[in-house]
């Protein structure tokens, strides 16, 4: 599976998460996954909540349109973004 897939207007992201980073950013490819660094620690769902908020802001969608399909408790996640209004340049290049 590739890191980024457009499927029926939704975006599927195969992510590798780096919690407790110095800043929030989309790092780039990490094998077959897209590496995303976030500042939140992986405690009590804080990293997942922060990831959802960060992705919602990056794709200009409400947090309710960001769904973690797989990997709630791990670093490897499959995330669906429903009808993104914006696609960051780092991800747009992977779609082509």
UniProtKB/Swiss-Prot annotation:
InterPro entries: DUF167, YggU-like_sf
Pfam families: DUF167
Domain of life: Bacteria
S-S bridge residues: none
A GO CC term assigned to this protein in UniProt: cytoplasm
Record PANTHER family: UPF0235 PROTEIN C15ORF40
HAMAP family, per the entry: UPF0235
Homology family: Belongs to the UPF0235 family.
Stored NCBIfam families: DUF167 family protein, PRK05090.1
Protein name: UPF0235 protein Shewmr7_1261
Protein source organism: Shewanella sp. (strain MR-7)
């Amino acid at each position: 599976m590739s890191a980024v897939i457009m499927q029926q207007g939704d975006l599927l992201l195969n992510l590798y998460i780096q919690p407790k980073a110095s800043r929030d950013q989309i790092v780039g490819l990490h094998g077959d996954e897209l590496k995303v660094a976030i500042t939140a620690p992986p405690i009590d769902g804080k990293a997942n909540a922060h990831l959802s908020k960060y992705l919602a802001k990056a794709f200009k969608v409400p947090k309710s349109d960001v769904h973690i399909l797989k990997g709630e408790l791990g670093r490897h996640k499959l995330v669906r973004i429903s009808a993104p209004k914006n696609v960051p340049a780092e991800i747009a290049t992977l779609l082509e």
